[in-house]
Amino acid sequence: MTKMTSIIGILMGVLTTATAASIPTGSSAAAAAALGSLGVSPPSGNVLIGNAGYTCSLLNRVLSKNETFTVTSPYYDVLIDEAWSENCRLNASCIVTPESAEEVSRLLQILSILETRFAIRSGGHNTNPGFSSIGSDGVLIALEKLDSISLSADRGTVTVGPGNKWESVYKYLQPYNLTALGGREAVVGVGGYILGETGGLSTFYNTHGLAIDSVTRFQVVLPNGTIVDATPTEHADLYKGLKGGLNNFGIVTEYDLTTNTGVDIYYEIKTYTTANTPAVLAAYATYLLDADINSNVEIQINPSYTLVFYGYLGHVSAPTDFDPFSDIPVASTMYPPTNGSLTELLLSIGSTGLTSEGVSYSGTFSFKVTGSTFLQDTYSTYLEAAASLPTGAVLSYVPQGVIPNLVTQGKSQNGGNLLGLDATPQVWANIFVQFPATLSQSEVAGSVDSLLANLISSAKSEDLFLPYIFVNDAGAKQKPLQSFGEKNIKYIDTVAKRYDPKRIMQRLQNQAYFVLEEL
C-alpha cells in the first residue's frame, strides 16, 4: 500500500503465530512425486517441507541464475533495499524475480508443493513489515521484471505489468497524449497500487473514480499454476472479487487499464501556516459539500505548515471552485497558477519521490463531511499528538476528501467493486509518521494508534464515523475487508475458496489482509 502517495506528499521530499506454526516441516514422498510431475528433480535425500533454505536451493537449480538471489548474491542487498520503508527491508531466505506469467506459475506450484512461505512485492512502497516482505523463513517474489507495457490497437486500453513504476507508464503513454489512472507519486509500483491497496487514488480520483475501477482485465496466476484472464465476461466472479479482494486469490501478472486523453489541467500549490490551517480545513469542508467533479483539492498537514494542491481538469483560469480558500493568507507559493499537462506535472514532482530513510507507520479512518466543525476539530487533536512524539518523529495528517461521484463511478464501471462505499461527501483520513530506526517503534506506533482511536471515538460521538478503511493507508492491525460489509467479504471468501481451495494465498503468503482472518 502506498503511504502519502499524493501530489503534496511527493513534495514532502498476517499470518498469526498459530498459523505460521502450522506450516509443516520434515520430508514428503508425495512432494517429491509432485515435483517430478513438474519435471523438477529434487536433490537426493529427503524433500524438506516448509524449509525456506531448502526451497531456495531448489529454486536456484530450477530457475535461471539471474532470477534467484540468496544472501551471498551481489544483487541481494540492492533488491532488499528497494523496499521504501526501512522497517520493511527484511532479509528473505532468497529473492526470486520471475520474468513471465509462466515462470510465476512454476514458482507458485513449487512453493505450494513445498509448503514454503512467501511474500509478493511490486514496487515495495508498503509500510507494513511483512506485507510485501518476508524474513529468513520465506521467499520474496519480486515482480520487477514483469514490466511490459503495450497499447491496444484502438488505444483504448494499456496493458501493464505489475513490476512497472507509474513513471514508466506515464512516459510510455505521453507521446500518444494519453494517460491512465495511476499513482500520484510516479515511483509507486503498479501492482501494489491497484490490487494490494484496493483501488488507488489518482490525481483526479473524484472525477474518474478509483484506479481499480479502470481495470478491464486481470491476468492471474492461480496457486495451482493455472493462468487465467479475469474480465467482466470471463471468470467474471474472479474479476469482481479482485475489485476489492486484494491478493487473496493468486498473483496478478497483467492489468488492462482504460486510457484517458491527456487533457491540460490547471494547478497551483500553496503552503499555509499552522495558525491558518483551521481556516483551510473549514474551507475544505465547504468545498467538499459542493465540489465540481472536475476539480481536486489535496491537503497535507504537518506540524509546522500545511500544503494544499489545487487542480482542475481543463485549460482554465482561476476556477471558482477554490473560492472558499481565496481569503486565507498564503505563506508561500510552491507552484504558481499554471496550465499544463498532468503527465508533465506528475513526472516533474514525482521524480524526486519521498525519502526512504527511516521507519514508517500509518493508519486510517473515514468520516462524513457535514456542516459541522469536526474536520477543523481534528487538527487540534493531531497537533497534540504530534507534539508528544519524540524528537525525530514527524507526524503528518492527510484528510483525503471524497465526493459522491467517486462512488457512483465505481458502481457504474464494469459491474462495480466490493468496497461498500457510501455515496456521501467524506474524508479518508491518513495519519502517517516517519522516524529514525533508533527510536522505539512500539512507542511511536502506540502514539499513532492512540491518536486514531481518539479521532474515531470523536467521529462516532458526533455520528460522523464511516466504517470504510482505505487499504492504501491502513495499518497492519486494521481489518479493511471487514469494512466492506458482510455481503462483500462473504463474496470474497466464496471466490477465494473457488480459485484457491487449498488456501495457499492465505496459509503460505506472509502477512496481508486475509479474508479468513477477517470473516
Swiss-Prot record:
GO BP annotations listed: terpenoid biosynthetic process
Modified residues (Pros-8alpha-FAD histidine): H125
Catalytic activity, EC: 1.-.-.-
Enzyme class: oxidoreductase
Keywords from the UniProt entry: FAD, Flavoprotein, Oxidoreductase, Signal
Pfam families, A to Z: FAD_binding_4 (PF01565)
Presence of keyword Glycoprotein: no
Pathway: Secondary metabolite biosynthesis; terpenoid biosynthesis
Signal sequence bounds: 1-20
Domain FAD-binding PCMH-type: residue ranges: 88-262
Gene Ontology molecular-function annotations: FAD binding; oxidoreductase activity
Protein family per UniProt: Belongs to the oxygen-dependent FAD-linked oxidoreductase family.
Function description: FAD-dependent monooxygenase; part of the gene cluster that mediates the biosynthesis of macrophorins, isoprenoid epoxycyclohexenones containing cyclized drimane moieties. The first step of the pathway is the synthesis of 6-methylsalicylic acid (6-MSA) by the polyketide synthase macA. 6-MSA is then converted to m-cresol by the decarboxylase macB. The cytochrome P450 monooxygenase macC then catalyzes the oxidation of m-cresol to toluquinol.
Remarks, miscellaneous: The macrophorins cluster contains a single gene insertion (encoding for the terpene cyclase macJ) compared with the yanuthone cluster that produces the linear compound yanuthone.
Protein name (database record): FAD-dependent monooxygenase macF
